[in-house]
């Protein structure tokens, strides 16, 4: 529910209105409508906001330090720097722009083969190709597989492909069958320095971030490559040969030939990678001389070498709110300070302004003075106990035009007259929703039309509001009769229209407006403090005047003010969650869930004055006790509510400091909310650093200046303040350009939000797409208040259609400069959950705006931010805030404790063992803030950050730094999913590290498998059948244990295809969720060993809840016994919160026990996905067998059967296990004896518990126990089986394994023609790790001499011999009269090259004859040619001798080698007359012959239907017979030939349906899906459509029939192997 941690967390959609407004009904209901303000008109067909949206007294209030995180690298410094104040010197870094600057290592280094460590400091830009290669080891030889080697980079981990990008490390040794990729534990953070390290020791891959181990894998084993292929390996930096290029800075780079330990990596990181040369250190780079070691790729560029200034601060000031929070005031440390320090809750005076509207004569006010005065008294009384007092200002406005109109609080005016009754718009003065809420009679409208009278029975949208007469001020009183939402005279206004008319400054007062709701149910609406509008004219509180200042209703305003000051409803955690799986559900009072107050018990929404009873919407709560029903933030009546809790009071004071300082007369600056932190010490000094003030300001605020936008370094950061687009605006205003102004406020990136601009907002859904046609597409123009020379641009693109990959959505960004020049930045790769950042350091001139272009009509843009270079002229005159350090005992007078722009202080006046308290005061002008919380430091003792864990001070870890995100927080608390060991702490992300530790046995499926309690046995499904079987979602995927990587998802829109690889769901259901008829889906799983069930366990991947619905899905479960009897286990609610679902089986003890063999599961939602079903039974205990034991028998748990009772336990037989060593506890195998079985090298344990349950154990040994004369486990050591060698193990080879493929066996290989064996040993050996040995010979692909090309001469002499390397060329030249096909008619190329390809064959090359154009059509049928129209062909027309005798020459022409004729034909003398009028025309053709019918005359031919085209078809073929693959010739005219025949013959001409003008628009149109229309421009095949996903139009078009991929040239119909390669 948060935005990104490095930028302002604002913009929670209200749980009440879904659009940023909190509301309070009149004890009846909450209004669910999203209310968005309209914008001024901007001319026809455009959508813009050309007026400023209101002045802010402060910038969008960032959390303290969040501004800084945008600009400042978070770096660990050298330990030596801890005692000094001087910043570290700048170091060099390479900047890669992502446009072909990848480097390759040119130094003659022997790259590590067996183990290595790679370390790099980098800062990545937001938005990358996926994958983006930071560095990688590749194989350049043609005779090896290209996916071998290792890569470090960034890629997306989500099925959707444009979200959740993470750092990754992938490796595939030359012996491995597949690549292993491990990912970091979270998305990468753009613009932040990070230290990455990757290690491999021949057994384990590990990835480290900032010294913390975040991922590991044991899949790859052994060496990386053999010495034989050393020369094939190339080390790349900044990208790959396939242009998977990285964008960002790379600073230090080092490569070791050993796997460094975590402690060594932490040490390397702190020394910034600078080492004295060591034998195991192969390469360390600080970019002093890049060209000496690295070279750019062919036709590539070199990255820029820059100086990077590491920030001098050691304290990470990036504080995150909890998952359910929004701003700094939700951070648990910050709000704890406000709870604990009374000084932070000192008296505050807040100004508020009541907007009271009168008529023009200053009469008939909206509310009376008595109401205003009484409400003010009640307000003052309610807040007086909490040190908040209110200063009233009343603004009287005389305007009859406003006073006589109805002001609507919660009605979207665009819904009036939309043929659907909207209760919130059902009011007398809206004509009862424009007639939509009335059953209308049909009056004689035509008789009353334009009769000069407003006829109320015709005053509805259906009758155009009486033809407009009811909105004519010359005819009627429009304040009572005008209901037309499009009329400027209408009798009602939306409350935001009122705000736009008044345009009251929201930065100095809390504005109180009055508006009505339909049926007067809505009592109030408030603006959250994190909304964009909070300090603008569109903010404030809207109240119902009928309740304002009325006894019994005065607490409504107090409730709404609570919302404005950051308070949620006390029932948020129960009644305002999206589902019972919502992470914000409150089960106990907490700072992190529900209403974020830990002194309000969970409660559901109700209006009674007492604890509520349980209800249907309480997620299993059986009762609520000690609920805060008397709280102002409940829905109880005024005679019940009377207080705020201390936590709520702290939140209100925090928001008054964070956001609303400008509402207060006091000029006191905001405090530093947290205690200063000790970041270093020496024997005689201590170093302190502290957080910025809570409001994020660094300079004194001055009216009319930009100082409130300036950060440390005098860098100006501003969001767009004016937006426009040529795209039309929707009437609701949602997705309008205005939504892209201000700071980002989308609550959930990657989900569509009305708080963004989208080009599709007002597109008519009935129009044919696309809305954004190529090549330009749609664009959004954003302007910034202050033109500046930019350093960087940040854009939040929060939604991209699944039809587009990350690179196609934003096809250009243009910078608009003051000089009038537009600078194009080109297409950009975007992620929907990571903002796009673009460096603009080279622009060098002032920019005032940007234009963002897109081809994706569903794209959504949330915000844009422009950052200046250092020392911006706009910030140079700003006065920095000062900080005063208060110490107890006090500092000496001569010690400077007053600092500015430096949040660091060194105290050298210390005594060993003395206790010191430090507080920070912020100074602005003559005003001082309240002191910060105190830091208590005992000189000579420990502190958080010294590497020693002081448990008595609450420390859980200490990694010797003050940085978050590395497993140990800056407050020395262990971070979620990390475990820290040793001192100083070494932290690792434990979930998925391959080690099953005691604390994660019950929680980590990845490391420990599915947890089974002691005494039980879980049996997973061995077979399955399903109701909706399909090859896309087969039922067999639920067999066995569920995939460890799957996470349960709730509130989904649809299920991606990737889910069907791990879980079953009814994927054949294609109709929309809302139109789904009642359907029962079922899954039945079978188990190989029938058992007495103790429980059924069901693992979910989705819980069936739909994104737009609150309904919880239920599931019905039955057990089937061995007699096919059904046993009902009841109905159960599905929830990801309770995953897996464990259903206990209760047996009726009055009935016999039964063995269960199957489980039947049924449900009704197509959004339920199940990944596994288990049957839990008692281990070594079977009640059914036990009950069958006869007299003299006893139940044996080992045998699980009845055995004859014996008083003396029997010994076990001698344990014999081949290929194993045994270590037994005794020489005698009596009852209870144990033996440890360890397999020899190359053998693996096989454990057999009974005939059906068999599994392999990877572990090296196992212990077996003698129980009642029988070993409890049957164990064998089987040889490792390497399987048939993979075809990539030796490229271009075939394998023969006559000895088998188990441990120690050998296979031979032979090179496939034309590959040549390079080396002598063509054998492979199966090794103990289950992989084949490195080959000691290779099959080098060579081409034989190229075959002769007809009609061409070989020009390259060496090509007449054999043995040509892959990639070599041979040159040919076509013989005279022949040319290369495809060359232009004007310049026919004769020379061409063929290349030796990777499969050992040559590229095809051909020479085709030169051809001449056909002679003019009037000679058709009269000439004979010796060889058609090809070179050297002779064509002649026989004329009578009289032609030659009269000197006209012979009628013979020759085709010359340049493609022209040697002459031209003439009409013979005897060829006289004219053609007869054309007949045999098809009925749908028409002919125009303006020149008559003489020889050579032409007649234009066309179709009567303008949507058809005229074509030629063969004889006896009609239009109905045309197959889709036929491309008939178009014909536009016929000509009368010299033989007095029409050509083409009119009878062969037909009319066929023409092509619709939507080819190449990314939608497959059935009418165009034929060769005649170029198969709709490629839109009907996945391989040819630009979006790589076929979208039929209309949606009902069958993808297997009319909208199928028919293009024979598409890859789908090409049998050639088209596999790509991994590793970028």
UniProtKB/Swiss-Prot annotation:
Residues 28-93 are annotated as: Disordered. Belongs to the peptidase M43B family. Homodimer; disulfide-linked. In pregnancy serum, predominantly found as a disulfide-linked 2:2 heterotetramer with the proform of PRG2. Binds 1 zinc ion per subunit. Residues 23-81 form a propeptide. Disulfide bonds join 141-232, 324-619, 329-654, 411-425, 421-437, 454-470, 471-482, 580-597, 584-609, 707-875, 710-878, 750-832, 772-778, 944-972, 957-968, 980-987, 996-1008, 1033-1067, 1048-1136, 1189-1202, 1212-1266, 1224-1235, 1239-1277, 1282-1326, 1297-1307, 1311-1339, 1343-1396, 1359-1370, 1374-1407, 1412-1455, 1425-1435, 1439-1468, 1475-1536, 1489-1499, 1503-1551, 1555-1573. GO terms for molecular function: endopeptidase activity; metal ion binding; metallopeptidase activity. It comes from the Eukaryota. Detected in kidney, spleen, brain, ovary, breast, skin, prostate, uterus, and placenta. Glycans are attached at residues 387, 398, 426, 516, 598, 616, 722, 822, 1023, 1219, 1223, 1320, 1516. Its cofactor is Zn(2+). Keywords: Disulfide bond, Glycoprotein, Hydrolase, Metal-binding, Metalloprotease, Protease, Repeat, Secreted, Signal, Sushi, Zinc, Zymogen. This is Pappalysin-1. It is an enzyme of class 3 (hydrolase). Residues 1-22 form the signal peptide. GO terms for biological process: proteolysis. One of its GO terms (cellular component) is extracellular space. The active site is at residue 560. Gene3D superfamilies: 2.60.120.200, Collagenase (Catalytic Domain), Complement Module, domain 1. It catalyses: Cleavage of the 135-Met-|-Lys-136 bond in insulin-like growth factor binding protein (IGFBP)-4, and the 143-Ser-|-Lys-144 bond in IGFBP-5.
